Amino acid sequence: MIGRMLLFFILLIFNTACFAQKGIPLSIGISEILHSKVLGEDRTINICLPDNYNPSDSVRYPIVYVLDGGVDEDFFHIAGIVRFSTQPWIDRFPQSIVVGIGGNTRRRDFTFPVENTDFIEKEGFQKANFPSYGGSEQYRAFIKNELIPYMGNNYKTNGKQTLIGESLAGLFSVEILLKQPELFDDYIIISPSLWWGDEFLLENADKFLQRNLKKNINVYLGVPNREEDVKMYDESKALSEVIKSNKQIHFVFDYMPDELHSTVIHQAVYNAFKKLYPKTVYSKQ
């Protein structure tokens, strides 16, 4: 009897061990540390490669850059949207490398210098919440002179680039669009914080575009429910009027009344791929 019980427990342990060994790690990307001489610090770069990415073949890919791209931010769900949109039976957007830029200094990195910060409290925020700000020029230099060349030197890229930013990252995306539009081919801008600097970018948007835009680009501007933040909506709408008047820009303005500032980014990115790259016929699987 004892022998049978011992045999039973041995078999139970063996079967449990065999069952546990069947699992394999599930991974959708890699994280790298890139030292920035411009910023004087290390930055975490999260990278999701296309399914068929092969370092040995000749295929090259576009890159989708996600500004709030930490693993605890927007990297995972936006990488999922890109992978979904590039499935063979959907084929809405070309297979792409997704690059999420991680970090916890967004208020410094995504804002431009201002003479005073009185406007912060007028917007309902505390000045103490912005102990460091005004670093957008350095951050643009990091992206242009360090991150983009790094990706080009270490991964198979084809030069086509998309930028995604929401809220303060949306403000920064607008700044790049206006001041260095040649950096990206597609801009996906969501609920931008145009209030920064007493609406300086909004007031000078037309002047910047007229002076700096030298190529055709695609721009998507998505905003959530107007009643949640009337000022943000009105600022975005005013910016949309400037953008759509420029003949070099293929522009989409997307109002999403069912979304809030905290929920809008996922739906907006999905909509951006759908609206910037419309397709009506899909393969059946």
Predicted features, each with a name:
Residues M1-I24:
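Bacterial Sec-dependent N-terminal signal peptides
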Residues Q21-Q285:
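Non-catalytic cap/lid and distal C-terminal segments of serine-dependent acyl enzymes
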